[in-house]
């Protein structure tokens, strides 16, 4: 009461506690997430693949109320952590001490009824990692080769990014429970980057007026023989000469790294170079460079056939046409080449006039509209993965994608 008046009453009315029809009280105060399925993720790192394959899907699953997921790089041996979970997904574990942890997890999984899923988005067996790859050293030791294979064999399921990698690991390890889930970019990260007016403005400025189109390659140093271990036989070995010959025709732009034989042109400013950006800043960096097209060369080897088409996805989201190596890696790409000369011909063809160019831009952007992570059918693939065993009839989306 306040000054003799019951709180909630007004003059001439019945106090709240005396009303004959009190407001119904909620019967279930359980938070909605309490009844959702739960799973755990163990990341390999916090670099690009950690986000593409683990962190971004985990964030989306939690944000859209599909399930409750927790992720970490810290291995936990407290058995109570694993009560009531559906599955654990482990990314690119390879060392002997990680094998010991997985052996312990295997016993917990068998006792508690959860599944172990191994995630890998690259070739990590040393015999198929190219000599020019600067990260090869991390997988050269005998114990790493043995531990990584053993862990894949021990898991109930393996997830990869493409069909070629599915066949590769199935052949190498004997584990046939391998599921392809492509790389799905978050729409909040890339979906707002398409700007048709800016694309046309960049064409008018650099192609029509200055007659020197800006051509971009954005990628890590893993594609280049930075330590000169392979006599410069890297992913640009077959296109280097045409880049050298066309520095007056195109403004070549490299982000992240560049082939060592082009170093003098980079130092002189004839080839433009920009350091790598943080992952969340990468789309803005590429957009700020005002490029007219992109390229994605690869040499044909097992390692590259197992690669995913991230460069095609990123460029298409921005509406920048990309010319990709004609390999299984880029089977979805719209413009493909085999030799360096073909790469130049493809660039000239798509840039030849504004009408043709804009058709390429729009077609590229439309080609990836079904690839957004937040698309219900894409997000539900992850839900099926974490909650249902391999080949289960209710995994309709994954079974269709993997032709099971």
What are these regions (language model features)?
Residues 149-178, 185-192, 259-261, 332, ...:
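A short, active-site helix/loop in glycosyltransferases that binds the activated sugar's phosphate group
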Residues 126, 226-234, 280, 284-317, ...:
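Nucleotide-sugar-dependent
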Residues 42-56, 60, 183-288:
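Conserved catalytic-core segment of nucleotide-activated headgroup transferases in glycan assembly
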Residues 118-145, 187-203, 208-211, 220-222, ...:
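Acceptor-binding helix/loop patch of EC 2.4 sugar-transfer enzymes
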Residues 107-108, 138-158:
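Membrane-proximal helix-turn-helix segments that form the acceptor-binding/catalytic region
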Residues 198, 355-396:
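A charged, aromatic-enriched C-terminal amphipathic alpha-helix characteristic of glycosyltransferases
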Residues 2-95:
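N-terminal pre-catalytic "stem/leader" segment of glycosyltransferase-like enzymes
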């Amino acid at each position: 009461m306040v000054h003799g008046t019951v709180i909630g009453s007004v003059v001439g009315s019945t106090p709240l506690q005396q009303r004959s029809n009190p407001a119904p009280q909620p019967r279930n105060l359980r938070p909605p997430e309490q009844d959702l399925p739960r799973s755990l993720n163990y990341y390999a790192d916090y670099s690009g693949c950690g986000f593409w394959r683990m962190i971004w899907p985990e964030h989306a699953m939690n944000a859209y109320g599909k399930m409750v997921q927790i992720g970490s790089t810290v291995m936990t041996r407290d058995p109570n952590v694993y009560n009531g979970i559906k599955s654990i997904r482990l990314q690119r574990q390879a060392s002997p001490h990680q094998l010991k942890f997985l052996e312990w997890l295997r016993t917990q999984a068998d006792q508690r009824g959860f599944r172990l899923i191994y995630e890998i988005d690259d070739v990590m067996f040393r015999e198929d990692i190219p000599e020019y790859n600067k990260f090869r050293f991390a997988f050269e030791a005998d114990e790493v080769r043995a531990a990584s294979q053993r862990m894949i064999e021990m898991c109930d399921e393996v997830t990869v990014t493409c069909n070629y990698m599915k066949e590769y690991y199935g052949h190498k390890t004997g584990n046939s429970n391998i599921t392809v889930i492509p790389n799905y970019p978050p729409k909040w990260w890339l979906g707002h980057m398409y700007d048709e007016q800016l694309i046309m403005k960049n064409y008018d400025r650099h192609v029509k007026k200055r007659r020197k189109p800006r051509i971009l390659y954005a990628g890590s140093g893993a594609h280049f023989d930075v330590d000169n271990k392979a006599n410069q036989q890297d992913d640009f070995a077959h296109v280097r000469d045409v880049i050298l010959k066309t520095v007056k025709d195109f403004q070549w732009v490299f982000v992240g790294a560049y082939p060592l034989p082009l170093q003098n042109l980079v130092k002189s400013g004839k080839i433009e170079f920009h350091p790598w950006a943080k992952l969340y800043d990468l789309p803005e960096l590429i957009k700020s460079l005002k490029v007219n097209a992109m390229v994605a060369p690869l040499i044909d080897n097992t390692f590259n056939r197992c690669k995913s088409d991230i460069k095609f996805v990123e460029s298409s989201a921005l509406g920048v046409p990309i010319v990709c190596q004609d390999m299984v890696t880029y089977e979805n790409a719209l413009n493909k080449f085999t030799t360096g000369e073909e790469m130049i011909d493809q660039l000239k063809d798509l840039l030849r006039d504004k009408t043709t160019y804009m058709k390429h831009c729009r077609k590229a952007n439309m080609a990836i509209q079904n690839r957004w992570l937040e698309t219900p059918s894409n997000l539900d693939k992850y839900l099926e993965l974490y909650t249902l065993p391999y080949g289960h009839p209710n995994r309709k989306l994954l079974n269709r994608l993997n032709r099971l």
